[in-house]
Amino acid sequence: MQVKDQLSSLQPYKPGKSPEQMKEVYGDHSFVKLASNENPFGCSSRVLDELQKSWLEHALYPDGGATTLRQTIADKLHVKMEQVLCGSGLDEIIQIISRAVLRAGDNIVTAGATFPQYRHHAIIEGCEVKEIALNNGVYDLEEISSVVDNDTKIVWICNPNNPTGTYVNDRKLTQFIEGISENTLIVIDEAYYEYVTAKDFPETLPLLEKHKNILVLRTFSKAYGLASFRVGYAVGQEELIEKLNVVRLPFNVSSLAQKAATIAFGDDVFIEEIVRVNTEGLQQYESFCRENDIPFYPSQTNFIFLPVENAGEIYEACAHAGFIIRPFPNGIRITVGTREQNEGVISVLQQHFENKKRKSRDEENA
């Protein structure tokens, strides 16, 4: 059976390893998962209370248009319901966008170190992928702008960026958008929007009134603590959302997921507390790094990236201590956990870097 030639160059997405997978390698003890940027505190208690009442609905198909959820999102964001598209996580929405917009021979432009699904789906659609290196961990919009051409159908901007946690500020993003043709779709992936505390972070939704080629993505998987429910959404011009809905699978968001997301979206107190605790957790890591001269990227997310050597060694050390982190070729990404979990990881990092310094001194004195 023949499939697309380009699939031979791709691999299925590999998420962070589960505790069960880790036990097969590192033994049967407990593991703390800090690899996939989930909320360690779970979701709003309102969600749990309400879902207890919903078990009898499961024999019925969900609302295919996610009407209540979309209206809830629209009301809070001050847009029309027709401007909102819901999907089974942002992964599905990225797939929908790629399938709807891209043709063989087109190209997309994005960063070299960013969420890999932009590249993945472009290749499936037979497109060229132009990847621009980050500048000190941040999207280099000037360089991205310089390679956009008539065949560029999508520019993907992950802001804040995954895996570095860095962000493009309001001035730079606005300037970039002004310089891009309206024939090119600019997708701004704001999966970590709720965690942002920077005063100059862009408010992108007002830009939709002026620019027809902008699509903003957000999710319930991170701050809202609903990763297993798989709910993400896009906000854009009505005409574009209407076309994307043609590609969307019917009944793509389950009834439980719709109800959970609708309830969670109304619990601002929960989000405020999550952001407060997350900010304290980031400060734990940043203080440790500064005190020990360990490089890191200041983060506007619920994770921190350390651009260090020997990521595999650090991953192994954390794994043996019961912590699952995410290694990269040029560093490690650690999800912010509870205070105690953060302290545990920091203790492992402290030991690793002390051993590294000791080994370096021994080699110099040999």
Residue ranges, per PLM feature:
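Active-site pre-lysine segment of PLP-dependent enzymes
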Residues: 123, 141-150, 163-186, 192-221
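Hydrophobic residues in beta-strands of the RecA-like P-loop NTPase core, especially within AAA+ ATPase
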Residues: 157, 188-189
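PLP-dependent aminotransferase class I/II
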Residues: 65, 213-290, 294-297
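PLP-dependent enzyme catalytic core of the Aspartate aminotransferase-like
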Residues: 312, 317-321, 325-366
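PLP-dependent aminotransferase-like
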Residues: 100-157
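N-terminal small-domain helix-loop-helix segment of the aminotransferase-like
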Residues: 2-89, 96, 366
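Short beta-strand
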Residues: 33, 295-299, 325-327
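Conserved PLP-binding catalytic core of the aspartate aminotransferase-like
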Residues: 279, 287-321, 336
